[in-house]
Amino acid sequence: MEPIEQQLTELRTTLRHHEYLYHVMDAPEIPDAEYDRLMRELRELEAQRPDLITPDSPTQRVGAAPLTAFNQIRHEVPMLSLDNVFDEESFLAFNKRVQDRLKSTENVIWCCELKLDGLAVSILYENGVLVSAATRGDGTTGEDITSNVRTIRAIPLKLHGDNIPARLEVRGEVFLPQAGFEKINEDARRTGGKVFANPRNAAAGSLRQLDPRITAKRPLTFFCYGVGILEGGELPDTHLGRLLQFKAWGLPVSDRVTLCDSPQAVLDFYRNVEKDRPTLGFDIDGVVIKVNSLALQEQLGFVARAPRWAVAFKFPAQEQMTFVRDVEFQVGRTGAITPVARLEPVQVAGVLVSNATLHNADEIERLGLRIGDKVVIRRAGDVIPQVVNVVLSERPEETRPIVFPTHCPVCGSDVERVEGEAVTRCTGGLICGAQRKESLKHFVSRRAMDVDGMGDKIIDQLVEREYVHTPADLFRLTAGKLTGLDRMGPKSAQNVVNALEKAKATTFARFLYALGIREVGEATAAGLAAYFGTLEALQAATIDELQKVPDVGIVVATHVFNFFAEESNRDVIVQLLAEGVHWPAPVVINVQEIDSPFAGKTVVLTGSLSQMSRDDAKARLVALGAKVAGSVSKKTDLVIAGEAAGSKLAKAQELGITVIDEAEMIRLLGA
């Protein structure tokens, strides 16, 4: 066997293995970018020796064979995949190939869409009624998922409107919005179920359940993007026209579909979508670019596994492979001990990543991770990089187990794990230097006491030199003592003292947030302050009384109750008040007497506001009788969505909650 034949055999075997893991087992082991690289390498070798191309080569077909647990459906019109481009130069070369094949010097009109990261499906309607649905499978035969698809509310069981073809096969993507993905994993962690690595795996796992009742509980959705069978009817002669017709018949279509009349317009669309990607509320991995004219599509035709008239323009990979060199353990302000993987540095989505959170001991066990393992790292938007999975097929021989500490790595105190919680915590409290540092950094932060000029490095030095043990000690600092710190001159020291003095005048909500009570964020602190009005009333509240506050359940109520029951915490509060920390007396609001559209409503703010700060908006809403919550739930009455609204907006839409924009909020504030 020639060396090139050996290379081809190995590449095909490797690709088939990963196709099986991806399409059949829903458990991909390598990132898409690595699969694409292997496929490109195989194509290049086959281009050198076309006589060695075999009919079963991965370059000659689409995917892997379906599971035998489902009935099979043969696609009358094969479900092909798309070729990919990864940079502007490759796209421009594709554009030129299309123009050359069309023998045209005029710009092609392109229809540009989002490349959804879900599961491709085919849905057949006969006389407007849904009769079957199938996965892509290997492109010619897929799995019968009709019962499961019927549970997806976004997909109509019957089309409405006129001139519906006798047989119409719609193709599109089933996917899981980010909010739904987070909810599924949250429920799984609570019940000990399977935690999914990403929304795509969750969507595939949900759709390919043998029990449709499980699928029905998952918030899957769908966008259509193409057609297969078309009999007994007509469709418009452009791709965009067809999408608009689908929408008119009741099929969901993405609202991010754009016609582009030049290559530059396509590149602009690509860049704009990439910029908006973190705020879409669902995962995409690029854009799809199609010749808009159906006549030109027919003229261009197909290659073995993909159309010549379309291409997927993929974003820089959000997943890459690297090695775990070590695992260190960090201690947070609540004592939570978090394992952090130290990685062989790797570029992920344009950022050099050398660390990734491992969350807790359960996550390490779920991954089966060992030090020295080859892993897939994912970084999506601003999310902290995380380990998606271990590449077990490439595990080195010299790996070693990760041993969770039995004592705090900072102060040496015992660690504990409360039954029902995934987190291991240091029991040292404020005797632990790490907890003390993080608690003080939180206390002085902008959204808490807002002490200008007191950064993390100053806090680190104050704790390390034993100048400060509790938040109250901060207000006893003098300019003279601060001047002794590194890179702190007399003027800077006096500025910090002045900032501390200014910070004494605060609000009840900010003060509560600054205390760092577990699970009490800004919105919960504001809710507690508004409901109880005074510190004395809050300290005297029972767990049952605390649960009457919007968005406060048994877990948060217990943390708040336990915090105020702890004598050392009460002592710190007394000291803070003695040092002059104060806030305005509460203004009692009778919601029944307020003539406002917000009175008595539970409101959630999401996204960025341009006309006022978020704090100002909250204050004005509360003054008009609203309860401002931090998360969307069935109890939410209204969501105000600013620019770049993300998962909260998606969840509101999923729950059918009324959504208004900033302009409407301002109009109602003045009503």
Curated annotation (Swiss-Prot):
The BRCT domain, residue ranges: 593-671
Disulfide cross-links: none
GO terms (BP aspect): DNA repair; DNA replication
Sequence positions that bind NAD(+): D32, A33, E34, Y35, D36, S81, L82, E113, R136, E173, K290, K314
GO cellular component: cytosol
Keyword Zinc: yes
Binding sites annotated in the UniProt record for Zn(2+): C408, C411, C426, C432
Catalytic residues, chain numbering: K115 (n6-amp-lysine intermediate)
PANTHER family named in the record: CHROMOSOME TRANSMISSION FIDELITY FACTOR 18, DNA LIGASE
Known role: DNA ligase that catalyzes the formation of phosphodiester linkages between 5'-phosphoryl and 3'-hydroxyl groups in double-stranded DNA using NAD as a coenzyme and as the energy source for the reaction. It is essential for DNA replication and repair of damaged DNA.
Protein name in the entry: DNA ligase
Organism: Salmonella paratyphi C (strain RKS4594)
